Each structure stands twice: as structure tokens, then as C-alpha cells.
Amino acid sequence: MIISASKDRADNMSIFLQKLIVETKWLNHLQPTNEDARWSRISFDVACPPHQAPSVKSLGITSQLTGSRADFILLDDVEVPGNSMTELMREKLLQLCTETESILTPSDDSRICFLGTYQNSFSIYTRLAERNYKPFVWPARYPRKTESYGGLLAPQLYEDIEQGANPGECTDPDRFDDED
């Protein structure tokens, strides 16, 4: 399940995933082989045993979650300036986000993953650790002072630094370069 601040944003992620399945050779096996499988841009199945719920479904954060079930929930940029300006708005948003826990299937493999950018110093992302999530930060460049991240720097980046990555270098050169 993909949840974003807006339904459009979540739909775009769903469309992107569907495109990856079709166009990436090593993901082609995920295309459904059954004619009855769902294959719309906002809700589709991958090649797997039949299930009542679609394999992938996109929703906006204020959409109705009741009745949905998911093994993996991706909350992608649920916090935006328009829904996080005030403390009350952030509390409501955090409550909506944690409601996803009730639709997560009870399995050792089930996961909830947040991807997002802090919108202000009171971001809901800073409060996820209080709710037993393991947050980490992945900046575009290796930091000069890792301690300024309060222990939240991504574990992979700590390893890279220990292995010689230099402060100021891009953490993901395929995505960012010195022009970004």
C-alpha cells in the first residue's frame, strides 16, 4: 500500500511501480499471468496467489483505510506544508499515520516505511521514534559532523564514512552530483 499526502502523489508512485514491473527485465515475472488480475493505475495485482486485496493500492493520507489490509505500507511524503503548519495539524497527521498500524497484517515480514522531508523543526518525522519506529536521515551529502544528526544518520552512511567516504561527497552519486 502506498499512502501520500495527496491521492495524486500516491497514484503517481503506483504508476511508477507498475512501469518498473513492465519495463525492468528482472521484475517482469511480477506481471500477473491471470486475465482476472487487477491491473489499473491505482490498484493492481502482481503474480501471486489470489487475494481479496490488491497487491498494490494507492491512497491519500485522509482516505478511508478501514477495510484495507497490507503487508507493506509505504508512507511517502505524507507531511507537506499544507497539513503540518500548526501543532494541531501535525497531531492530526500523526494520528492518521499511526492508524495504518491497524491495517498492517500480523506477520513477521509486515512493515511500515516512512519516506519524507522535514517541513519544519516540529516535523512528525522527529516523533516517530517515540512510537517505536526506527527513523534515520539520509542527506544528499556526507556530513562533516555526524553527531549533529543525533544518532539518526542512516547506518549505511556511518559504514561508508568508516570506509573512507569524505565529508561533502554525494551519498548517492547516481541521483545527485555537484550540480545538485
Per-region residue spans from a language model:
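Conserved nucleotide-state-sensing and coupling region of NTP-binding domains
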Residues: 2-65
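A structural signal for short, well-ordered beta-strand segments and their strand-loop junctions
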Residues: 2-4, 57-58, 74, 113-116, ...
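An acidic- and aromatic-residue-enriched active-site/binding cleft used to recognize and process polar
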Residues: 3-8, 61, 78, 117-120, ...
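Acidic-enriched, low-complexity/disordered segments with a strong bias for Aspartate over Glutamate
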Residues: 8-11, 36, 45, 71, ...
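Alpha-helical scaffold elements adjacent to nucleotide-binding pockets in ATP/GTP-utilizing enzyme cores
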Residues: 12-20, 69, 73, 92, ...
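Conserved RecA-like ASCE ATPase "motif II neighborhood" in helicase/translocase motors
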Residues: 41-99
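Non-catalytic, compositionally simple segments
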Residues: 83-180
